Amino acid sequence: MIELEKLDFAKSVEGVEAFSTTRGQVDGRNAYSGVNLCDYVGDDALRVLDARLTLAMQLGVDLDDLVMPRQTHSCRVAVIDERFRALDIDEQEAALEGVDALVTRLQGIVIGVNTADCVPIVLVDSQAGIVAVSHAGWRGTVGRIAKAVVEEMCRQGATVDRIQAAMGPSICQDCFEVGDEVVEAFKKAHFNLNDIVVRNPATGKAHIDLRAANRAVLVAAGVPAANIVESQHCSRCEHTSFFSARRLGINSGRTFTGIYRK
């Protein structure tokens, strides 16, 4: 049994579940120790498959109902629909290559992303029956991937002021120290730096609030601020519960954040 961190929306949503996996029992000497569903970060393939099978069984879905992209810090969004489901496995994998967000209205399909400090965002318009998930690292945030997801949801029939968004466990501002080139990227992308950047007085280093930056992107895209909630779990501070590349290194497991219509 995998312990799941339930992600709640600001308003009650019927028939939709959203969650992030936790690592479970951890061997501190092994950066992959615990529950990892990501198959392209160097973990043992059989361990990853076992974790996926366990989660699918726990959620009451088939293994091929777990859909996750091969993320590359892009701003590409894929729609998981009947046409996608009709593709063979190789065609599906090709369609998910270089994708960092998914949208679907299909019931019983668990869409999700894998993160280790980046911000996972789940979104829903329950009236339209549309759910989505995105992976927003600093590059995806600068590229406003959350806006791209909202726009795709609306193309599929969602109404922007009905959309609710919840951010899963991710790195907190205190832990997310960045170089000046990252600050400059946010500046060039016209983010309000006063809202998202602070300097550590002792080191002079910049720290960015990725959650606040993504909240700003969502609000600018038309999602009501009252409809956005953020997990307060920091992946780096709580690296024994959630994977953290900053703490464990890039060769480590990933936290899976998913959403589905029951």
Curated annotation (Swiss-Prot):
Temperature dependence: Optimum temperature is about 60 degrees Celsius. Is fully stable at this temperature.
Domain of life: Bacteria
Ligand binding (Cu cation 2): C172, C175, C234, C237
Effect on the protein upon substituting C234Q: No effect on Cu content. No effect on catalytic activity
Protein's recorded name: Adenosine deaminase RL5
Organism: Unknown prokaryotic organism
Note on how the cofactor is bound: Binds 4 Cu cations per subunit.
CDD domains found in the cross-reference section: YfiH
Stored PANTHER family: PURINE NUCLEOSIDE PHOSPHORYLASE LACC1 (PTHR30616:SF2), UNCHARACTERIZED PROTEIN YFIH (PTHR30616)
Cofactors demanded by this protein: Cu cation
Residues that, per the record, bind Cu cation 1: H73, C75, C118, H135
Effect of C172Q: Loss of 1.0 of Cu/mol of protein. Loss of catalytic activity
Enzyme Commission number(s) of this protein: 3.5.4.4, 1.10.3.-, 2.4.2.1, 2.4.2.28
GO MF annotation: an example: oxidoreductase activity, acting on diphenols and related substances as donors, oxygen as acceptor
Keyword line: Copper, Hydrolase, Metal-binding, Oxidoreductase, Transferase, Zinc
Entry similarity comment: Belongs to the purine nucleoside phosphorylase YfiH/LACC1 family.
Subunit structure: Homodimer.
Function: Purine nucleoside enzyme that catalyzes the phosphorolysis of adenosine and inosine nucleosides, yielding D-ribose 1-phosphate and the respective free bases, adenine and hypoxanthine. Also catalyzes the phosphorolysis of S-methyl-5'-thioadenosine into adenine and S-methyl-5-thio-alpha-D-ribose 1-phosphate. Also has adenosine deaminase activity. Also acts as a multicopper oxidase able to oxidize a wide variety of polyphenols and related compounds in vitro.
pH dependence: Optimum pH is 4.0-5.0. Activity is very high over a broad pH range from 4.0 to 9.0. Exhibits more than 70% activity at pH 3.5 and 9.5.
Catalyzed reaction equations: adenosine + phosphate = alpha-D-ribose 1-phosphate + adenine; S-methyl-5'-thioadenosine + phosphate = 5-(methylsulfanyl)-alpha-D-ribose 1-phosphate + adenine; inosine + phosphate = alpha-D-ribose 1-phosphate + hypoxanthine; adenosine + H2O + H(+) = inosine + NH4(+)
Phenotype for M68A: No effect on Cu content. No effect on catalytic activity
